[in-house]
Amino acid sequence: MGDHGRAYQHITPEFCHHMKDFVSRGDIITPNLTEACLLTDTPYPEHDCTDPELSAISKKLHALGVKKCIITGCPKGDTFLNYISDSSGNVDTVSTKKAGPGYPGTGDIFVSIVSALTLRGFSLQECTTQAAHFIASCISYSQSLSNDTLQGVIFEPLLSDLVSL
């Protein structure tokens, strides 16, 4: 839906309205901070997001009907914070050191790992930790090969890291 505080060009208010309805039926959603703001009609913070701000955004997502939520990639200094919450009010966070620039497709890899590990019985905190660390490894690896960020991360050589889980 968007990144860095801006909706993608093709995302309309009507699309956002329908997406709110769609995510209301979700057991687990993994919006990035921009997407969470779009879904909750919250202005995107132009500073590192605070825990109270993330709490307010996650409560709005749960008010839509979402059971569990991971707001991904929230910038906090030299780290990215993943804010995990459920509709009962439980909250956890997973931080990873910024490994390099943003790459397209990392959210898709993230949700794929979370989905697979959830089905294997991992807790949402464990899923988030594994996914966040795998993404950071992929970014570092891609940077070491001077991979163009527009090509996405190189993750295939690192897949064996996930097989052992």
Stretch-by-stretch model annotation:
Residues 1, 35, 73-77, 97-100, ...:
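Glycine-rich beta-alpha junction loops
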